[in-house]
């Protein structure tokens, strides 16, 4: 059973939480939403700008001081090629809306791009894991929340075997961690 939310926008923090094993519960919630997107129960959107934000922090947060390799970058970029993650191009229309939101609501440039992408795509909700609530400023334009489980009575702890069978289209490598992304049974 899924929520009545059909169109979800993720900013970069949701993807980063999905990639990091240490995120625990947040990561499980992101996996649940990705399952629902993969299975066609919800439509998941993000900006093409998200790709740069997701890969850039990995150089410090996950991989230590070394730069991530071109192969690691390609593996992470593969996540953004999943057909169930719909990309919103940072085009003239989104850029104009971002400028307006930055001016009117005092959002950072990055947050204004995400907010503008969500507004232009007419999503039901913009989801993010940020500690600050910058997106709350635009809640009259689009609903804003932290990602949440969509599966009714979702288990609090996914068995290891469930994670090993996760998703079918890519293998994302973050630093020394390998996340196998395959279909679940």
Sequence positions of predicted segments:
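Extended, non-globular alpha-helical segments
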Residues: 74-79, 86
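PIN/NYN-family metal-dependent endoribonuclease catalytic core
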Residues: 7-10, 28-64, 82, 86-90
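Conserved glycosyltransferase catalytic-site signature
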Residues: 12, 48, 92, 110-115
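Internal catalytic-core helix/loop-beta-alpha segment
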Residues: 96-100, 104
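Acidic, PIN/NYN-like endoribonuclease modules and their adjacent C-terminal/linker elements
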Residues: 1-7, 36, 115-185
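A short secondary-structure junction motif
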Residues: 15-27, 49-72, 100
């Amino acid at each position: 059973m899924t929520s009545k939310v059909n169109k979800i926008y993720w900013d970069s923090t949701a993807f980063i939480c999905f990639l990091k094993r240490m995120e625990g519960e947040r990561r499980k919630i992101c996996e649940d939403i990705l399952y629902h997107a993969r299975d066609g129960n919800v439509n998941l959107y993000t900006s093409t700008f998200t790709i740069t934000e997701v890969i850039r922090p990995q150089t410090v947060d996950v991989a230590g001081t070394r730069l991530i390799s071109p192969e690691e970058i390609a593996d992470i970029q593969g996540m953004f090629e999943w057909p169930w993650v719909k990309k919103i191009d940072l085009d003239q229309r989104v850029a104009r809306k971002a400028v307006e939101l930055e001016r009117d609501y005092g959002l950072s440039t990055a947050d204004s791009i995400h907010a503008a992408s969500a507004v232009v795509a007419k999503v039901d909700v913009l989801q993010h894991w940020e500690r600050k609530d910058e997106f709350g400023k635009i809640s009259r334009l689009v609903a804003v929340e932290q990602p949440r489980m969509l599966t009714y009575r979702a288990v609090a702890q996914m068995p290891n075997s469930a994670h090993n069978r996760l998703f079918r289209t890519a293998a994302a490598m973050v630093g020394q961690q390998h996340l196998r992304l395959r279909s679940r049974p």
